[in-house]
Amino acid sequence: MRQCACALAIVATVAAQAPAPLRTLARGRDSRITAHHELVARTAARWQLIWHEHAGSSAAPDVDFSRDMVIGVFGGSGGPDASIEIVGVTREGGSVVVRYREQRSPLDRASRTATIAPFHIVVVPAERMPVRFVVVTSPPDDLAGHARHDAVQRATPTTC
């Protein structure tokens, strides 16, 4: 009986850290959000506000907030090679962990006329847990070892 309980605990731990399915809503280099932000929208009202700040007057993509939530990472103003990519979302302990890769490039005189503001916005299954954002510094093909390579962790309040 004790072995069965231990096996169930191990399965529950592994399941809790399984990657959440994510779907990209938008990704690019032309956001109107020109400061670095990590955002979570759990309601349609919050999502509309984020989308309007990001894209202006265009309509926000539809999201079913009874099932899903939106996570966005905005890189702020950057040089011509700047980019953002959300590489994974997992449940770990009592929080949702969003891992993303950020490529920064300096603004030089030539690139100041064409500001790059990279972003990545995804939809994931809704969770009420706090969300933590982690910048991943590992190479793209080494995400399995993410714990060794996480550089920065930030917590985002769940009041969104």
Question: PLM features: residue spans?
Answer:
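Exposed, flexible binding/inhibitory loops of compact, secreted disulfide-stabilized domains
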Residues: 16-160
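Hydrophobic h-region of N-terminal signal peptides that target proteins for export
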Residues: 6-17
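Positively charged n-region of N-terminal signal peptides that target proteins for export
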Residues: 1-3
